[in-house]
C-alpha cells in the first residue's frame, strides 16, 4: 500500500491504493475535491461522486495519479476509483496552520483553473459587486 509521499514518484496515469484522512472538502465549478493526508504528507483528491466526510479516514483505491508542472501531484478517484471508510484513524502530523495554508493554495489554484476553463465566472472585487467604489 502506498503512502501520500509514494504517490509523487508514480507517473501520471498510474493507479495506487493508499490510506489517508480527509482534512478539507471543497467544490469548484462542479468538481468535488478533498485535501487528504497521512504521516508522509498531504495531497489533493478529485472525488467525483465518492461520498467522504471531513475528519474520517479512508482507503482510496484505484486512485489515478496526476503529475503537474512545478512538481506537484494529485490523485483522482472520479473515473473508477473509490473511497472506503476504515476504522483506524490515519495519523496526520502536520499542524493546523500548515494544513490550512495548503488548503488555501490548492483551492485557489482550482478556482483559477475553473475560471480559465469557463466553469466559474471571472473574479470581481467584492466592493464592485455591492455597488461600492474600488
Feature-to-residue mapping (PLM):
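Beta-strand/loop nucleic-acid-binding surfaces
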Residues: 31-56
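OB-fold nucleic-acid-binding modules
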Residues: 1-26, 51, 68-134
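Small-residue (G/S/T/A) turn/hinge positions that recur once per unit in extracellular repeat modules
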Residues: 61-64, 81
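Generic beta-strand structural signal
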Residues: 56-58, 73
Amino acid at each position: 500500500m502506498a503512502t501520500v509521499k509514494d504517490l509523487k514518484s508514480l507517473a501520471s496515469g498510474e493507479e495506487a491504493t493508499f490510506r489517508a484522512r480527509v482534512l478539507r472538502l471543497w467544490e469548484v465549478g462542479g468538481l468535488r475535491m478533498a485535501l487528504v493526508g497521512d504521516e508522509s504528507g498531504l495531497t489533493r483528491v478529485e472525488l467525483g461522486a465518492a461520498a467522504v466526510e471531513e475528519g474520517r479516514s479512508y482507503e482510496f483505491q484505484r486512485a489515478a495519479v496526476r503529475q503537474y508542472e512545478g512538481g506537484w501531484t494529485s490523485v483522482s478517484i472520479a473515473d473508477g476509483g473509490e473511497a472506503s471508510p476504515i476504522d483506524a484513524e490515519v495519523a496526520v502530523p502536520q499542524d493546523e496552520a500548515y494544513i490550512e495554508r495548503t488548503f488555501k493554495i490548492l483551492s485557489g489554484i482550482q478556482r483559477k483553473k475553473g475560471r480559465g476553463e469557463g466553469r466559474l465566472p471571472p473574479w470581481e472585487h467584492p466592493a464592485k459587486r455591492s455597488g461600492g467604489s474600488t
